[in-house]
């Protein structure tokens, strides 16, 4: 595998931009008969796979950290909502069932924070297998926990959890996109098991 630098305006290059679920932008890139000179080659021919794998591991470690930040923000706004929203004359946070759900969200976030820290520490490893194993484990675990925290936050806010006026729905959408970026939870579980089998 080799990497090439291609001008987006070169003949044969077409882009189709579209909005992502979280409001960001992405594009499909189509290459049809694109011709490149030797100067477009980045690095040495055939040596790009380790560079790509390392870059993807760095991107995944960064997404782990972003997801934990969003999970923490969801915990904060949800706790505040439970303290202020009243039902039957008392804050809904007084109901034990909702306290348990909030506690589950906090536990999931703190465990995810530990996994994100593991990914951040190991992403600089010179051992590619160790790096990939740690990052894949973190992505798989955080993907599942982010889904739990996001869904609980939306549910605990009731109908307010999906209105544009609150950040809860926006945070949930971002967690959903993070969960699918560079592979979903099942993909990262597969990567993790592959690194164990190869060891």
Each language-model region and where it sits:
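FAD-binding core of flavoproteins
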Residues: 1-76, 80, 90, 199
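Alpha-helical interface subdomain recognition
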Residues: 54-199
């Amino acid at each position: 595998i080799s990497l090439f630098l291609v001008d987006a305006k070169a003949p044969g290059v077409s882009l189709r931009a579209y909005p992502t679920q979280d409001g960001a932008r992405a594009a499909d890139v189509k290459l049809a008969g694109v011709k490149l000179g030797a100067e477009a080659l980045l690095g040495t021919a055939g040596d790009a796979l380790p560079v790509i794998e390392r870059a993807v591991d760095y991107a995944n470690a960064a997404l782990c950290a972003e997801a934990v930040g969003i999970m923490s923000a969801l915990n904060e706004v949800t706790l505040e909502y439970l303290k202020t929203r009243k039902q039957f004359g008392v804050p809904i946070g007084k109901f034990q069932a909702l306290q348990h759900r909030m506690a589950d969200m906090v536990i999931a976030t703190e465990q995810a924070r530990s996994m994100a820290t593991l990914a951040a520490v190991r992403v600089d490893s010179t051992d590619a297998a160790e790096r990939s194993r740690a990052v894949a484990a973190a992505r798989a675990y955080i993907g599942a926990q982010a889904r739990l925290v996001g869904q609980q936050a939306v549910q605990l806010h009731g109908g307010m959890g999906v209105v544009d006026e609150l950040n809860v729905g926006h945070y949930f959408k971002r967690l959903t996109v993070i969960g699918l970026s560079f592979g979903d939870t099942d993909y990262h579980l597969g990567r993790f098991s592959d690194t164990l089998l190869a060891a």
